[in-house]
Amino acid sequence: MNKRSWFIPILIVAINVLAIMMRWCSLSELLPAHYDLEGNGGGTMPRSVLLLYPLIGAAVCLVAYVIARMKQKLQTGLVILASGICLVLLSSAMVTLTAGTMPVFMLAEPVILLAAVAGFVACVVKSRKKKKAVISH
Protein backbone atom coordinates (compact mmCIF):
# COMPACT_ATOMS: atom_id res chain seq x y z
CA MET A 1 0.00 0.00 0.00
CA ASN A 2 1.24 3.47 -0.84
CA LYS A 3 1.62 5.26 2.47
CA ARG A 4 2.49 8.55 0.76
CA SER A 5 -1.11 8.94 -0.38
CA TRP A 6 -2.07 9.62 3.25
CA PHE A 7 0.11 12.73 3.23
CA ILE A 8 -2.74 14.98 2.04
CA PRO A 9 -5.32 14.22 4.77
CA ILE A 10 -2.62 14.32 7.46
CA LEU A 11 -1.42 17.68 6.09
CA ILE A 12 -4.99 19.02 6.28
CA VAL A 13 -5.24 17.93 9.93
CA ALA A 14 -1.87 19.57 10.65
CA ILE A 15 -3.02 22.84 9.03
CA ASN A 16 -6.17 22.69 11.18
CA VAL A 17 -4.07 22.31 14.34
CA LEU A 18 -1.75 25.13 13.24
CA ALA A 19 -4.65 27.50 12.46
CA ILE A 20 -6.24 26.86 15.85
CA MET A 21 -2.96 27.24 17.74
CA MET A 22 -2.14 30.52 15.95
CA ARG A 23 -5.43 32.05 17.10
CA TRP A 24 -5.80 30.26 20.46
CA CYS A 25 -4.54 33.08 22.69
CA SER A 26 -6.64 35.73 20.97
CA LEU A 27 -9.88 33.72 21.32
CA SER A 28 -12.23 34.35 24.23
CA GLU A 29 -13.15 31.48 26.56
CA LEU A 30 -16.67 31.30 25.09
CA LEU A 31 -17.13 31.35 21.32
CA PRO A 32 -20.31 31.54 19.23
CA ALA A 33 -21.49 28.01 18.47
CA HIS A 34 -22.79 28.82 14.99
CA TYR A 35 -22.99 31.65 12.49
CA ASP A 36 -25.48 32.68 9.84
CA LEU A 37 -24.38 33.80 6.38
CA GLU A 38 -24.18 37.43 7.54
CA GLY A 39 -21.62 36.48 10.20
CA ASN A 40 -23.97 36.83 13.19
CA GLY A 41 -23.09 34.35 15.91
CA GLY A 42 -25.54 32.38 18.01
CA GLY A 43 -25.24 30.14 21.05
CA THR A 44 -21.96 29.59 22.86
CA MET A 45 -19.35 26.89 23.17
CA PRO A 46 -16.05 26.76 25.07
CA ARG A 47 -13.02 27.38 22.89
CA SER A 48 -11.67 23.94 23.87
CA VAL A 49 -14.31 22.44 21.54
CA LEU A 50 -12.14 23.70 18.67
CA LEU A 51 -9.56 21.08 19.64
CA LEU A 52 -12.06 18.36 18.73
CA TYR A 53 -11.98 19.33 15.03
CA PRO A 54 -8.40 18.16 14.33
CA LEU A 55 -8.83 15.20 16.71
CA ILE A 56 -11.91 14.03 14.81
CA GLY A 57 -10.02 14.59 11.53
CA ALA A 58 -7.11 12.48 12.77
CA ALA A 59 -9.53 9.76 13.94
CA VAL A 60 -11.22 9.74 10.52
CA CYS A 61 -7.80 9.33 8.85
CA LEU A 62 -6.86 6.51 11.23
CA VAL A 63 -10.12 4.62 10.65
CA ALA A 64 -9.85 5.10 6.88
CA TYR A 65 -6.22 3.90 6.96
CA VAL A 66 -7.16 0.75 8.92
CA ILE A 67 -10.01 -0.02 6.48
CA ALA A 68 -7.68 0.62 3.53
CA ARG A 69 -5.19 -1.89 4.98
CA MET A 70 -7.94 -4.50 4.84
CA LYS A 71 -9.45 -3.46 1.50
CA GLN A 72 -6.53 -2.21 -0.57
CA LYS A 73 -8.68 -1.64 -3.65
CA LEU A 74 -10.54 1.09 -1.78
CA GLN A 75 -7.42 2.96 -0.68
CA THR A 76 -7.77 5.83 -3.15
CA GLY A 77 -11.47 6.24 -2.36
CA LEU A 78 -10.82 6.24 1.36
CA VAL A 79 -8.06 8.84 1.01
CA ILE A 80 -10.47 11.03 -0.98
CA LEU A 81 -13.23 10.59 1.61
CA ALA A 82 -10.90 11.18 4.57
CA SER A 83 -9.47 14.28 2.87
CA GLY A 84 -12.97 15.62 2.25
CA ILE A 85 -14.06 15.09 5.85
CA CYS A 86 -10.87 16.70 7.14
CA LEU A 87 -11.40 19.68 4.81
CA VAL A 88 -14.95 20.12 6.11
CA LEU A 89 -13.64 20.05 9.69
CA LEU A 90 -10.95 22.58 8.75
CA SER A 91 -13.62 24.74 7.14
CA SER A 92 -15.73 24.59 10.31
CA ALA A 93 -12.73 25.62 12.38
CA MET A 94 -12.00 28.50 9.99
CA VAL A 95 -15.59 29.77 10.30
CA THR A 96 -15.08 30.01 14.06
CA LEU A 97 -11.56 31.44 13.81
CA THR A 98 -12.70 34.17 11.40
CA ALA A 99 -15.71 34.93 13.63
CA GLY A 100 -18.12 34.02 10.85
CA THR A 101 -16.90 36.85 8.63
CA MET A 102 -15.95 34.48 5.83
CA PRO A 103 -19.17 32.69 4.85
CA VAL A 104 -17.36 31.14 1.87
CA PHE A 105 -16.15 28.46 4.31
CA MET A 106 -19.74 27.59 5.26
CA LEU A 107 -20.82 27.50 1.62
CA ALA A 108 -17.85 25.30 0.69
CA GLU A 109 -18.60 22.59 3.25
CA PRO A 110 -21.50 20.85 1.46
CA VAL A 111 -19.65 21.11 -1.87
CA ILE A 112 -16.49 19.56 -0.41
CA LEU A 113 -18.44 16.76 1.27
CA LEU A 114 -20.45 16.03 -1.87
CA ALA A 115 -17.25 15.89 -3.96
CA ALA A 116 -15.58 13.59 -1.41
CA VAL A 117 -18.53 11.20 -1.33
CA ALA A 118 -18.75 11.25 -5.15
CA GLY A 119 -15.01 10.48 -5.39
CA PHE A 120 -15.36 7.60 -2.93
CA VAL A 121 -18.37 6.17 -4.78
CA ALA A 122 -16.52 6.46 -8.11
CA CYS A 123 -13.59 4.50 -6.65
CA VAL A 124 -15.93 1.82 -5.26
CA VAL A 125 -17.69 1.48 -8.64
CA LYS A 126 -14.35 1.33 -10.45
CA SER A 127 -13.00 -1.38 -8.12
CA ARG A 128 -16.18 -3.44 -8.55
CA LYS A 129 -15.96 -3.17 -12.35
CA LYS A 130 -12.36 -4.42 -12.21
CA LYS A 131 -13.43 -7.25 -9.91
CA LYS A 132 -16.23 -8.30 -12.30
CA ALA A 133 -13.86 -8.13 -15.29
CA VAL A 134 -11.37 -10.42 -13.51
CA ILE A 135 -14.11 -12.89 -12.52
CA SER A 136 -15.58 -13.07 -16.05
CA HIS A 137 -12.20 -14.01 -17.59
Question: Which residues does each PLM region occupy?
Answer:
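N-terminal membrane topogenic signal
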Residues: 1-11, 45
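Alpha-helical transmembrane segments of integral membrane proteins, especially early/N-terminal helices
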Residues: 8-19, 78
